[in-house]
């Protein structure tokens, strides 16, 4: 079973949604049968790599509210995050363009580290107040994930993974995503937003009921073997 999660490193609800999904997945009886894939999405593809505003100022400008109102709005997010064991430090966060951070996720995916890199990026931005558009930050995250930071620098200085990021952003829109986080289960069920863990558990159970593996009963329990044709022979002479 496959769960694809579209998110942006800059999105506070995406990190919260990630934790709530993980909590739901932890309660799912068949969690070992679930493949989780983190997909790329950019809330602001035109964001600067060297932002002029901090998070409070950026949101105040975008939504036409005062800085004080912006701080109050973010206080609620800090509380939600804390309830999940996450530490949000908005006062020091640097809201830079996330495109290269998404390229790092794809670099990680190419080396079997997609999920680890996504987690490290969220922590770097929300908790550690790292500048996730800077090469040295991304190289440090790569190293923390057990990847080659010099190979990452070569990749980021080329066109590597650019089309993959753009394609996933476009695909989210094609699937009907109006925002992130956006969860798609087996390309059939979509869950939008940082829902509570029980919502994710419900959709996982529903999907599993539809795709659960076929159970072949053991004929030995009846004392007789069923008659079959194999690839190269039919047991006609053995018919009763």
Pin down the residues of each PLM region.
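Glycine/alanine-rich phosphate-binding loops at beta-alpha junctions
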Residues: 1-2
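Short, N-terminal intrinsically disordered low-complexity segments that are rich in Pro/Gly
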Residues: 7-10, 14, 45, 66-67
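Structural alpha/beta surface segment adjacent to cysteine/selenocysteine redox centers
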Residues: 19-125, 222, 234-235
